[in-house]
């Protein structure tokens, strides 16, 4: 969530200024509208990440989405004033799809870690998203936009490697109900 939601929060806060400073002649309102495409992808992408996790597996889905996120940010690092603005917006929205879908994929894993602590684990995941945003925006205060995007891509690459060590949940987990009976829940 550090790399997914953290980068979303950071990018959403800097993207209008990035467009304004990168493309001559844009008004602040137009730059903001163009940048809103990044956040708009959330409506479709986040549920899609969760759905894909349920259908094809959590580890595989998270791996593909994190890799796509890293590639997307590498592409964003190449945007300059010579780019055609619609192409820059499309690249931004494509990157955003992987970011937002990755968030859904992260939360597909959360209830399988320790079912009785799902709320606490979800809260910790959310907190790490905020920590990611603070870290990325701190980096942005010292570097240019291109380097900022590359730092996010590099951190996503590290997360990609870490995901490869994740055990894919399989079989069933036991849930003890209030009456003392045990219910088995399929996790595949």
Where are the predicted features?
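Extracytoplasmic gate region of multi-pass secondary transporters
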Residues: 1-43
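Residue-level signature of mid-helix packing/kink "hotspots" within the transmembrane helices
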Residues: 39-47, 130, 134
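Helix-to-loop junctions at the C-terminal end of transmembrane segments
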Residues: 45-57
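Cytoplasmic membrane-interface "Motif A"-like loop-to-helix N-cap segments
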Residues: 54-66
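C-terminal ends and interior cores of transmembrane alpha-helices
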Residues: 67-82
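Intracellular juxtamembrane helix-capping segments at the cytosolic ends
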Residues: 101-114
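A late C-terminal transmembrane helix in Major Facilitator Superfamily
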Residues: 116-144
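Multi-pass alpha-helical transporter architecture, strongest
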Residues: 153-182
């Amino acid at each position: 969530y550090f790399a997914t939601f953290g980068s979303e929060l950071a990018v959403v806060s800097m993207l209008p200024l990035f467009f304004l400073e990168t493309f001559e002649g844009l008004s602040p309102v137009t730059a903001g509208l163009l940048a809103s495409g990044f956040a708009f992808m959330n409506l479709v992408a986040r549920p899609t990440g969760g759905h894909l996790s349920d259908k094809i597996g959590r580890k595989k889905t998270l791996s593909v989405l994190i890799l796509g996120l890293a590639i997307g940010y590498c592409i964003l690092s190449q945007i300059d004033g010579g780019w055609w603005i619609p192409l820059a917006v499309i690249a931004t929205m494509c990157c955003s799809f992987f970011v937002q879908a990755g968030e859904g994929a992260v939360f597909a894993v959360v209830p399988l870690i320790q079912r009785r602590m799902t709320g606490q684990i979800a809260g910790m995941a959310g907190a790490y998203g905020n920590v990611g945003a603070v870290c990325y925006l701190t980096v942005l205060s010292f570097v240019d936009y291109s380097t900022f995007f590359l730092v996010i891509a590099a951190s996503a690459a590290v997360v990609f490697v870490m995901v490869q060590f994740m055990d894919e949940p399989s079989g069933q987990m036991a849930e003890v109900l209030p009456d003392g009976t045990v219910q088995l829940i399929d996790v595949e």
